[in-house]
Amino acid sequence: RLGLDEAVLGMLLLCVGVGSLLSMPFTGLISGRFGCRKVILVSGFIFLAMLPLLASVESVWLMALCLFLFGASIGMMDVSLTIQAVFVEQAAGRAMMSGFHCLYSVGGICGAGGMALLLGFLAPHLAMLVICLFMIALLAAFGRHFLPYGSEGETPLFVVPRGIVLLIGVLCFIMYLSEGTILDWGALFMTAERGT
């Protein structure tokens, strides 16, 4: 639709990573001030607002902005959902994090399968709209059950990671770099080379 070469496409895809990278460090602070429930809901609605735009914009600069906001919303959701999971785990008094991550993956599989099924019956823009409306309904229905916890005290804007936290951060960086490369370029390869 935009008639992009691989260099411009690569720069556009980089906007997703830049958005995530810039939003993640501040999500903890924002969640502490306003509560992670609000952050989850706002980032979720931004994410869902970007999906139809990504399927329809015809300007490279507007696409770059949408991809940046898309990435920022994903980064904020990842961090705030993990904070929420920690609160739920603490309230339950038992280890639940691995189960949450498992359900995250199951949700991804169901979403991809549902979209593939819809594409068999509907035009891509309409299928995207159906998925977005379904997700908005889920957020509206279940978002009120998220724990609203924030922090009562003052928290620093940024803390330099040390020790095991720094090591985990480096591992997460490598993991996200690999995941992003496979997801972005793998989808393009399947479309261009395999026609799927």
Name each model-derived stretch:
Residues 1, 68-69, 162-178:
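Pair of pore-lining "gating" transmembrane helices in MFS-fold secondary transporters
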Residues 1-7, 184-196:
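Short amphipathic helix-loop junctions that connect adjacent transmembrane helices
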Residues 22-61:
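Conserved MFS/SLC helix-loop-helix module at the cytosolic interface between two early adjacent transmembrane helices
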Residues 67-102:
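Cytoplasmic helix-loop-helix junction between adjacent transmembrane helices
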Residues 125-144:
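Symmetry-related core transmembrane helices of the 12-TM Major Facilitator Superfamily/SLC fold
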Residues 138-169:
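Flexible interhelical linker loops that connect adjacent transmembrane helices
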